[in-house]
Structure formats: structure tokens, C-alpha cells
């Protein structure tokens, strides 16, 4: 019984037959029964498979990589009560974004349907704020109003067990308050609210204008 309890503290499992190696997040037996949906292999940043167990260990299980897999690339979805670990293409994309941001370079990530866009967006927005001290706010900008509630609920479900706050903006006034409150945080808002704030609400020379103008912000769109 004690041995079974010990496994309750494990967040990531690795299985291998030496020639093929996979990893997956700790899950209930019923979830694991679905098999391939929860088990994934590793690929390098050029998308070449890393199958050999020693090569996998060098790429994923060394320090600090193993720590980062848990601290930076694991999500506890509070709504679904499920532990999730990002897939390698998501991790490589976020790492590339972080490296580019440190050099003040913009970029984009290609995503297909069902590839985990929301979770990638959450972790990218979250990690930029956590890893780069000079960034005061990260803003996840949505281009359609109908996605606002959906994205906000997903982000807040991920953040419930995280070390970061996610604030939504129900209107332009709320957006201005979030931007001027002095807290380091992630903000979820729409392009329409941001445009309205810039074009109609902010007036040059006011305290709000000066504070927002001088903010160091990273946008994830």
C-alpha cells in the first residue's frame, strides 16, 4: 500500500523498451485506458523523433530540463481535474518564443486544429511573464468576442493551481484598471477593447495615459 501511495506524488511517467520511449502525465486508470491519446514521444526542435531511451534521457530528463517539464510545461486543469503535460512541439514553440522575446524579436507559431492552441497560448503568456523580469504585464489578445469567455475560462482553470494571476476584462474600464494597477499579471482581452481604449478612452497627458504608455508589455495574439 505504501508503494502505491508513493506513486501519487509522481507527475510524469516515462516508459521505454530501449528502442522506443514515451512519456505521459499521471492520470486515472480510466484515462490511461484510452492509450495513445495521453502517451506521446519526444521530437527535437527540428521535429526528428528521439526514440532511444538514452537520447530521451539526455534531452528531457537532465537537470534543468526535467525540472522545467514539471514546473513550466505541466498544467493542472482545475475544471477537468486532470494533469496535463505539453507535447514536444508545444514546448519547442514556447522556448523559441521566449528566446526571441529576450532579444525583442516578434514571431508567430503555426497551429493546426486540435494541436492544443489554448494551452500553448496560456503557457507562452505565463512563461514570458515568469521568466523575463523586465516584463510587467503579458496580454493574451483575442481577435473575436465569442472566444473571449471560452479563453478566459480555460486560462482561469489552468491558473487556479498555478503561481500566477489571470485577469479578464469585462469592459474597457476594467482593461484600463488592470493595466494601471501596478500588479505583474496576465490579462485576457479582445482586440476590440484594446482599440477602443487607445482610440477613444486614453487622453495624452493624463496619469492613465502616461502609466500605460510606459508599461513593458508582451503581447501574445
Cite the ranges covered by each PLM segment.
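Conserved motor-coupling elements within RecA-like helicase/translocase cores
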Residues: 171-187, 210-211
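Hydrophobic positions in the central parallel beta-sheet of the AAA+
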Residues: 140, 187-189, 219
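Conserved RecA-like P-loop NTPase helicase motor core
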Residues: 2-3, 192-195, 218
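ATP-dependent helicase/translocase motor core
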Residues: 1-137, 146, 150-161, 182-185
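Short beta-strand/turn micro-motifs composed of small residues
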Residues: 16-17, 142, 221
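Conserved ATPase-coupling elements of RecA-like P-loop NTPase cores
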Residues: 197-201
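SF2 helicase catalytic motif II
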Residues: 207-221
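Conserved helicase motor
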Residues: 145, 166-177, 190-196
